[in-house]
């Protein structure tokens, strides 16, 4: 979605931090639209957007490195408020005439700042003499302030942890206010955009809807669009948004790749045909997908194979429809972040997603991705704005590659059927216990491991099933759900008793990070 017509935009210059998108999230929570751009193209973006304020993100580089990233000088010369975070603080310091250096006393994780002087940045939050918890991740520090700047706070290893120039409305902070581990961080960012930058904060999902519809119409024109519908919240919201924008230029296609949950394809078709009146085609491509995936153990190759086959199927269906110019997907921020830096900046790739990094380089259709700037909870809010029922909006996320990435190792039809049954029982137990809405995402994983068991008087040698459940807000970080042991025992017993091929059940207690929510 372009922001050229939005008068109150915050430009976020991305230096490669994995938390850059969380900055955007916090700014949006404050009711202010934001756009992330890589530092390499920040000058052009600044001229295009004419932002009301600029935030410089953190990043993995050191200002001492030759060729390390810098913000365009226009950011500091234009007279708009600027906030530098972590590496962004270092870049601001050096570019404004101060001095920064690599430090032997690094700060990672929880830290504390001591307030030395009151500042508009933390007005109503922190006062002189107070000590407050923050979250840091840096190896550099400021050793000399730029001319006209003053210190507002210090930390154990940095005498200039918070500095600024009140008259020019420029501030630098060594910590990360965007993460939840800085308790007052979100309010500090609100102070910056509302009080210092003077932005009212009137951006809402209704506003996003209007801008997205306008952007879709501009991109699509009179072209035909096919939408990859999975029945999940993301693709459903994308389909409704695009349908609102271009009407009968849209055709939805549900590809049954043989990797869906139990009875899912039939349920999705019934819901969308009966309740939303969207043109929907069901394609049974299960043989095509499973044959291509059978025996493949590399998770990246699985994802890329699925991405390639999806495009092949969509292009085949487009021909049957007389041609299509665009392929629409429900790609979200976290999908893009884990595949490659959203902005093309220097963030580290974690894994490819089938609808991002798994796409072939050559396609005969252009992509339409109206949700790629939104977090999951924002998509749910947009779905509510579009009229989707709460019961549907609250569904757990389900990945496009489906059960393929919940079946580590080689895939077979037999394994998929075992996993499908175990997953259905697990989710049924969660619903019966009244826990479904308290959990962000829950699913079963069939491990490529067999163990010895005893059932009746006989020896068994069958698969291990891992259960996964996490709590999260936006999918960027997650904690495992703390079940009562009685629940886990009951779910495990039912799975072992009812699913032939499983004789052992384990529970995954890994958070994100260090793990990802999905196993592959």
Curated annotation (Swiss-Prot):
Molecular function via GO: ATP binding; GMP synthase activity
Catalytic reaction(s) noted: XMP + L-glutamine + ATP + H2O = GMP + L-glutamate + AMP + diphosphate + 2 H(+)
Active site, per annotation: 86, 176, 178
Start and end residues of each Glutamine amidotransferase type-1 domain: 9-202
Pathway assigned in UniProt: Purine metabolism; GMP biosynthesis; GMP from XMP (L-Gln route): step 1/1
Keyword Protease tagged: no
Annotated GMPS ATP-PPase domain residues: 203-395
Annotated binding of ATP, by residue: 230-236
GO cellular component terms attached to this protein's record: cytosol
Source species, domain of life: Bacteria
EC id: 6.3.5.2
Entry keywords, A to Z: ATP-binding, Glutamine amidotransferase, GMP biosynthesis, Ligase, Nucleotide-binding, Purine biosynthesis
Subunit annotation: Homodimer.
Function: Catalyzes the synthesis of GMP from XMP.
HAMAP family the UniProt entry points to: GMP_synthase
PANTHER family reported for this sequence: GMP SYNTHASE [GLUTAMINE-HYDROLYZING], GMP SYNTHASE-RELATED
Full protein name: GMP synthase [glutamine-hydrolyzing]
Species, as recorded: Mesorhizobium japonicum (strain LMG 29417 / CECT 9101 / MAFF 303099) (Mesorhizobium loti (strain MAFF 303099))
Gene: guaA
């Amino acid at each position: 979605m372009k922001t050229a017509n939005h008068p109150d935009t915050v430009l976020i210059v991305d230096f490669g931090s994995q938390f850059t998108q969380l900055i955007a999230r916090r700014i949006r929570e404050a009711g202010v639209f934001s756009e992330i751009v890589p530092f390499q193209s920040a000058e052009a973006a600044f001229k295009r957007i004419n932002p009301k304020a600029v935030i410089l993100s953190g990043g993995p580089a050191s200002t001492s490195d030759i060729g390390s990233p810098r913000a365009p000088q226009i950011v500091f010369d234009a007279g708009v408020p600027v906030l530098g975070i972590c590496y962004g603080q270092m870049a601001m310091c050096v570019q404004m005439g101060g001095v920064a250096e690599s430090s032997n006393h690094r700060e990672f994780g929880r830290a504390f700042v001591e307030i030395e002087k009151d500042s508009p940045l933390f007005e109503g939050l922190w006062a002189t003499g107070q000590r407050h918890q923050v979250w840091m991740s840096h190896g550099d520090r400021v050793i000399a302030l730029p001319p006209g700047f003053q210190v507002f706070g210090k930390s154990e290893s940095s005498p200039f942890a918070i500095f600024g120039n009140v008259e020019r409305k420029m501030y630098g902070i060594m910590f990360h206010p965007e993460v939840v581990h800085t308790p007052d961080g979100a309010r500090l960012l609100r102070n910056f955009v509302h009080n210092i930058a003077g932005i009212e904060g009137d951006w809402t999902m209704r506003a996003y809807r209007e801008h997205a519809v306008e952007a879709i119409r501009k991109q699509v024109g009179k072209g035909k669009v096919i939408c990859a519908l999975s029945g999940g919240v993301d693709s459903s919201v994308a389909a409704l948004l695009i349908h609102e924008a271009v009407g009968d230029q849209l055709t939805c296609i549900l590809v049954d790749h043989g990797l869906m949950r139990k009875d899912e394809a039939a349920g999705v078709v019934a819901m969308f045909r009966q309740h939303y009146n969207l043109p929907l085609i069901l394609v049974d491509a299960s043989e095509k997908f499973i044959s291509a995936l059978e025996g493949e153990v590399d998770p990246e190759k699985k994802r890329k194979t699925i991405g390639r086959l999806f495009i092949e199927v969509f292009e085949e269906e487009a021909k049957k429809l007389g041609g299509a110019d665009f392929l629409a997907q429900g790609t979200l921020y976290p999908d893009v972040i884990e595949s490659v830096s959203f902005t093309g900046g220097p963030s580290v790739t974690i894994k490819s997603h089938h609808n991002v990094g798994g796409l072939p380089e050559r396609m005969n259709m252009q992509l339409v991705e109206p949700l790629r700037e939104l977090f999951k909870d924002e998509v749910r809010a947009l779905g509510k704005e579009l009229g989707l029922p709460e019961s549907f909006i609250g569904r757990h996320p389900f990945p496009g590659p489906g059960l393929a990435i919940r079946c580590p190792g080689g895939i077979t039809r037999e394994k998929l059927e075992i996993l499908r049954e175990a997953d259905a029982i697990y989710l049924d137990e969660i619903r019966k216990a009244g826990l479904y809405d308290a959990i962000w995402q829950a699913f079963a994983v069939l491990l490529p491991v067999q163990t010895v068991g005893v059932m009746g008087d006989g020896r068994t040698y069958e698969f291990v099933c891992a259960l996964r459940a996490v709590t999260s807000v936006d999918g960027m970080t997650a904690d495992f759900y703390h079940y009562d042991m009685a629940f886990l025992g009951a779910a495990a017993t039912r799975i072992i008793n009812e699913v032939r091929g499983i004789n052992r059940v384990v529970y995954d207690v890994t958070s994100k990070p260090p793990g990802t929510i999905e196993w592959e």
